[in-house]
Amino acid sequence: LLLADLTGKKDTTDLVLALPENEMGGVTLQLLTNVDGEFRSIQTLALGAGSYNGCAALHAGTGRDDAAYLVMDAWADGNAMVSDIILYDAESGSLQASHPLGLSDPQRSTLRYHTELLSRDIDGNGTVDIPAEIDDGGDLQTPVDKRLVFLLWKDYANNSGGNSLFGVYDSKENFFMALPESMHGSIMIRGNQSSTGWLICNREGTVVYCEMRVVDLDEPESIEYERIATIGSQQLQARMVTSYYGLSMDYIKSNTVLLGTA
C-alpha cells in the first residue's frame, strides 16, 4: 500500500495497492484516486508474470520531466529481490511499466540475493535509488566475503540512465558505505587484526586506505578512530590510514548509511 500524489492533482492523494498474487504469478497493482472523499479504482496493471511473484515494497518518486513514478521491490524465486519501475502517464491517465536506458532487463539489472536491500533515496537527492549486487567491485577476502558485497545504486531518473553510487554493503551490521567511483574494481577488502571490522586496501592489499570497525559503545574515540554511527548497543568507527583522493573522514561520515533507518 502506498499513498502518494501520482496523478498530479495536488489537492488529493492517490492510493496504490499491490494485490495478492494470482495463479499466473507476478504482481497486480491497483490505482485508486480520491473522488469526493472516496477512493475509487481507476486502473489495474499486471506486471512481472514469470519473473517475480510478490511485492515487498512500493516507493514513490519524481523522475524526468517531473513525471511521477513508482519503484516496486518484488520477490523473485523466494530467495532474491528485483525491482521494477512504473510511470504514471498523465496523457493516458494510467500507470505503465517503464524500462529506461540501462534497465532494459530489470530482473537482471536489479537482482540481489540480500533480500533486506530495498530501494530508497540512498544519496539524499530526492529520487529513488535501486540497489544491485555487482561482481566487479573489487576483491573480497575471506572471511569478510561472507558479510560484504559490492553494490551499485542507480536511480534511472533521466534519459541518460540516471545517477549511480558505488560502494560496499555490510550485511552483518546492515550499513552501506559509498566509495569514490575511482575505487570501483581497484580495491581489496580484508578483515582487520582484531576481527571487529575490515580494511579497504589497494588491489594488491599492500596499502591500507581506511578501516571500518564495530566496537562497544563505551569504547572511546581517539586521534585515530572516530565514531560514524551508533548501531544498537555498539558503535561504528572509522580510521583513515593512507590518503586517497576523494576519501576522507568527512566523506565517510556523510556517505555511510544505516539501512535499518529511513
PLM features: what roles do these ranges have?
Residues 23-33, 77-90, 136-157:
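Structural motif
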Residues 239-262:
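Surface-exposed amphipathic alpha-helical segments
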Residues 97-120:
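Conserved blade-ending motifs and adjacent loop-strand segments that build the rim/top face
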Residues 8-19, 62-74, 122-134:
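Acidic/hydrophobic-patterned starts of short beta strands in beta-sheet-rich repeat architectures
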